[in-house]
């Protein structure tokens, strides 16, 4: 149990630092769409799709690695709370179109990235 807790801790911290770096680098590039948050959510969605595909095929992977990558790293990297706050800020500024676009791109993009990764890595591990 301690190993699993440490895996979540290390993965979560690493994912959170990665999200912060993405936000620092990419959020200033666009006034309405926080590109760093979007990148974090899309990358995290892709990684978790890839992980689930691999983990469903390779049953001998240590659960510590599964938890480190999915709950830890992807949990720290992706952020629904920051995304929600950024949408609320756009709404408060009266930027309703940008808020809606932000919701659309984050949600559909994340679903698409997870499905794409799952499909790609399920196909690659099937051979």
From Swiss-Prot:
Q: Which PANTHER family match?
A: FLUORIDE EXPORT PROTEIN 1-RELATED
The way its activity is modulated is described as: Na(+) is not transported, but it plays an essential structural role and its presence is essential for fluoride channel function.
The record's section on NCBIfam families has: crcB, PRK14196.1
Where in the cell does this protein reside?
Answer: Cell inner membrane
Membrane-topology annotation of the record:
Multi-pass membrane protein
- Its source organism is Escherichia coli O139:H28 (strain E24377A / ETEC)
Main localization of the protein described in the UniProt heading: membrane
State the family named in the UniProt similarity comment for this chain: Belongs to the fluoride channel Fluc/FEX (TC 1.A.43) family.
Q: What does this protein do?
A: Fluoride-specific ion channel. Important for reducing fluoride concentration in the cell, thus reducing its toxicity.
- Entry-linked InterPro entries: FluC (IPR003691)
Spans traversing the lipid bilayer? 4-24, 35-55, 71-91, 103-123
Q: Which named protein is this?
A: Fluoride-specific ion channel FluC
């Amino acid at each position: 149990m301690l190993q699993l807790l440490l895996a979540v801790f290390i993965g979560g911290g690493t994912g959170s630092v990665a999200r912060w770096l993405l936000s620092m680098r990419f959020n200033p590039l666009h006034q309405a769409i926080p590109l760093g948050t979007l990148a974090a959510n899309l990358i995290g969605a892709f990684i978790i799709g890839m992980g689930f595909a691999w983990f469903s095929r390779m049953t001998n992977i240590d659960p510590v690695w599964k938890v480190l990558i999915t709950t830890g790293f992807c949990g720290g990297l992706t952020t629904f709370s920051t995304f929600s706050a950024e949408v609320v800020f756009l709404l408060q500024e009266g930027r309703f179109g940008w808020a809606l676009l932000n919701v659309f791109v984050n949600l559909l993009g994340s679903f698409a990235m997870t499905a794409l990764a799952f499909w790609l890595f399920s196909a690659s591990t099937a051979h």
